[in-house]
Amino acid sequence: MKKQDFTTTIIVGQTPSQVFNAINNPQNWWSGEINGSADKLNDEFTYRYKEFHLSKQRIVEMIPDQKVVWLVTESIINYAEDKKEWTGTKISFEIAEQNNKTQLRFIHLGLDPDIECFDSCSNSWSQLIQQGLFSLITTGKGRQIFLG
């Protein structure tokens, strides 16, 4: 049986271009410290949230207004036994027009129920996409999800 990668979907009234541009500014919706760039193919950036999470992403696929894929090239999840369990996974954003709205399908390929951080990581992604990124797309201002 195929393992189910984590996925969540939002639908907004903004254009695919607006959704695409918001995705490519993770510092405005992914709560934590971000260094580097996510503007174009092969860009790299690091993400850190306190002492819990550090990861490095490289943009490996970018189709304007349609799709963005990040490859996690390094990761340290401090509360997991396998601290590198995100390394080699891919984070995909698929954009599609649907009934005069824009659908964004988020998939973390490799984040499945067998991964130790699945529950906490999938909960965090749900909040980040459904609240943080959604707010950035719909209001122009991202929302900090993890406070304190």
Predicted segments, located by residue:
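Hydrophobic ligand-binding cavity/cleft-lining segments
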Residues: 1-38
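Residue-level preference for beta-strand/loop junctions
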Residues: 2-4, 51, 87
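Generic structural detector for well-ordered beta-strands
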Residues: 9-11, 46-48, 58, 94
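Hydrophobic pocket/interface hotspot
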Residues: 19-20, 45, 59, 70, ...
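Hydrophobic-ligand binding "helix-grip"
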Residues: 31-36, 53-99, 109
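Short coil-to-beta transition motif at edge beta-strands of beta-rich domains
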Residues: 39-47
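A conserved amphipathic terminal alpha-helix motif
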Residues: 110-148
